[in-house]
Amino acid sequence: MSWVRSVPLEQMRANALALARAAKALDMPLVLTSSLEDQMQGPLTEELAEIAPTEYEGRIQRSGMVNALDDPNFAAAVQATGRRNLIIAGVTNDVCTVYPTLTALQQGYRVQVVADAGGSMSRLADDVALRRMESAGTTLTSTNMILTELAVSWASPAGQALQPIVGALIPT
């Protein structure tokens, strides 16, 4: 995460963790992956282990594969969810998010990329990656947008479960 300069790091971290909390609250599949944890990319943030211990423990640790969907274990884990609609966020948007998004679109998935739950080394790199994904057919969204879309109504069970997660993101 420390590579990100396109968005405030703490905001991005809070957004990514909110997505994980929402997935757990709504009993949605959560597939985590990392690349070269013991090298320059480093491990996933430890807060994910607290929020989603089973998913963190079962994360797909890629051995340098840039496009996560080129990794057979990750591709199998995504397919095993049985879902055709994917919500994707990652660090960095211009590497770790763009390529699996493009591949997922080619494979017929509907993809929403949560732009503010990831970032890139520069604003320009982020903008280019987001434009490329959008022009290929992904829907760009924000953390607040996707959480409220999943809520549908604050009176619904999903809305009730997501209220504290969304509320924690409101600037004070």
Describe the predicted segments one by one:
Residues 1-64, 110, 127-135, 139, ...:
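Active-site acidic carboxylates
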Residues 8-12, 89, 93, 97, ...:
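Short, conserved glycine- and acidic-residue-centered signature motifs
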Residues 33, 114-116, 143:
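Generic beta-sheet signal
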Residues 42-44, 70-73, 98-101, 124-125, ...:
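Short, well-ordered secondary-structure micro-motifs
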Residues 62-102, 106:
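Internal catalytic-core helix/loop-beta-alpha segment
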Residues 67, 94-95, 118-123, 147-148:
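Short gly/pro/ser/thr-enriched loop/turn and capping motifs at secondary-structure boundaries
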Residues 87-90, 110-123:
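A short glycine-rich beta-strand->turn/loop micro-motif centered on a GG-aromatic cluster
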